[in-house]
Amino acid sequence: MFMLKSLGKYIWGNTNSTEIVQIPYGQLYSVHENYRECMFKDASASIRRTTAEFQYQLVIQRAYEEGEEELEDDGDEAEDEQSFLLDEKLHLRFDVNKDSITIMWDNPDFQDGTLYEFTCENCLQEGVAYTFEMVALQCMYERKYRQSHEKATLADLEQFSNPITRPSKEVDSLENIVTKLDLESEDLMRLKKQEQLDDEIAKKYLLGQQEAEEPLVQQQTSIVNPEKEEVTKTENIKSLEGELMGTISAELHLFDAVEEVFILQDPNVEASVFDLGDWNYWFTISTEEKTWLSQSVDADMNPVFSFEHLSFIWNYFDANSNAFSWLLRFDSQVRMEQFQELLMRALWESLNQQRWLKIDDEQRDYVMETFHEDEELEDSEDEEFARQQLLSRKEEEEEEDEEASDFEDSFADFSDGEADDLDESRWRKEAAKEHNSLLAVGYKNDRSYVVRNNKIGVFKHVDEKGLKFQTALNNLSTPKGKSLRPSKLMLHNQDSSILFQTENAPHSLYHMDIEYGKIVDEWKVHDDVPLVTFTPDNKFAQMTAEQTLIGLSNNSIFRIDPRVEGNKLVAEQFKQYATKNDFSSAATTENGYIAVASNKGDIRLFDRIGVNAKTALPALGEAIIGVDVTASGDFVLATCKTYILLIDTRIKEGRYAGRLGFERNFAKDKKPKPKRLQLSPQHIAMMQRELKGGASFTPAKFNTGIDAKETTIVSSIGPFLISWNLDRVKRGFTDSYKIRRYDANVQAEDFRFGTDRSLIVALPDDVAMVDKSSLRRPTRESICTPVKKLRSKHDIVNAPY
């Protein structure tokens, strides 16, 4: 608790600052005898000096997100800030951990037992929580004894610290009546880890009891599991504790992966959702006689709602990670809408850990519409035009399948020259036990760069369908000889340089001269600002001599200029935000507009650094791991683990119709509805052997080029390379994707610059150039058949590159 006391001079040193220490994000609650009220859902806590000697204040200040409208008619600024004189009469209580803190204190305005509580969970840098507690105790010591805290012993400070004692009875905060079923073990839900709980309940409750239904289930199991694992009979759910959120009747169908159709299992089942507490939710399908399945509500369900067919499709994974695709069909749109809100409420609360009913109607509609099987993104066309589009789409797919039937990928070849052979031999020998991890495609020099441990392989693009190993940049290291392994990579300065970051140096960027083949600079960004990610100043900046780039920390955006003396962060172009935004990725348009995504799942659109976002799009729940944007800024791609979002940023109506969301904000009820790209639950059921272990999409990308139109989106998941036709996606055909399966997981992929026909694909031990026409519609054949490899004269199929 007091391990940071020796740092007191550093913490207290700046007497010109009123603020001594701060926790930048958390929530403030008012705790009463029978309920707990959230006062500020986003807040910061700080300890400030006052003008009086030995007097300090604990200050809780509300924070606003960009795009959040403040109530102008209140006129009460005091509501946005609560301050308390740090005195022992507050009876401060602390619960401090490495990365979290909870503080409780008496409400000085009431004597009825009302308390305040400030909580920040699992998001602080190590030491911040302990520092805050120590400073608070030192302030109370100074007030009581009217002398400097430097004279205090640890025992002197401990008298002001009290532990937090929770009431034995949980407070029910305006929730529905809890429905409890009989328990075999009352503590089962609380004591088991969620993964273990999933497996145990899945084993007991997934499959049917009736003898007549066993052949069908065994047939499905044999499709997805060649070992023909024996299916055990199950009993009804005998124990489940939780709040019954709702139950809806429907038909139940199971996907047959051999026939590629859904087969009716039961004409009348009850689909129920339970709230188990602690943001855990449970989904069951049952009748009076049996329980069909029981599973946790999470993103791996891959939920798809089709209002055209009044159906809901999702995935269930058993204890052995075998995937099953199930379908519920409803008898009316009303019932389906009721079920959708029921399930989406549970899923959203699970991912966001806040109450669905506390967000506004517009945000709830935004979330639910994103999970619909899509309509058109653009203005509707007439019926005849739509019919012709469908016919054209079908004909084009058939033509592409015919073209793809005999296609073989062109894997990288090595050169004949003596010097090149030496490079190849050294590369293969030194890198034989390592695997590819990162890919960067050149815009100007027609080359691709592939990272493998502390080496970078350079591959030249040959003709339209070939790659040729050119050289290896070996033994990446600092001037002092410290080995470096890139974790993020970017080409820079007309493709003459590579900038990269390593995981163990979050405050630095390394600058490599490609021609020289050595690291020439280490750029210290800032001692107190860790670099989460970085991106070019604009879409095509790497083709120019532009020196600056854009950097992100968890809650700030700034410019990096290597020409600045000392730290490379430009102080005049640094914007820090009050709340914990948890930024994760960024991309820029041709004009330098910036799209920024976060691990919370929200997206912000900026026209420049140093201002609040023009548009803030709500989070769906999953963390965003990558973002891309078209050169014009019309469309943004945001990649999550189980789906990809396509967002049209063009404002469609009103005063700013025709402008971009980067330039003007959308009306509150007119925010763009994302198109949700994902694998269909049916295809996941057929791919399940390859997607075991929680496979994730790689960051999706548009094709790009000077004056080129973006027409295609590419990503991958596990061993499957996947592409979407952008025009078809805009017209609502989000399930119209093409795939190509490899015999190893795809590590990274991107388009060759200036074309949408050629793709560069990095596998663990190979690099290939792929013709887009080789990707095929997902069928049992295309899903189960890996790509044939063309062996080079050096027979490098299983060797590095």
UniProtKB/Swiss-Prot annotation:
GO terms for cellular component: cytoplasm; cytosol; nuclear envelope; nucleus. Pfam families: VID27, VID27_N, VID27_PH. Keywords: Cytoplasm, Phosphoprotein. Residues 372-384, 396-423 have a biased composition (Acidic residues). It is found in: Cytoplasm. It comes from the Eukaryota. Has a role in the negative regulation of gluconeogenesis. Required for vacuolar catabolite degradation of fructose-1,6-bisphosphatase (FBPase). This is Vacuolar import and degradation protein 27. It comes from Schizosaccharomyces pombe (strain 972 / ATCC 24843).
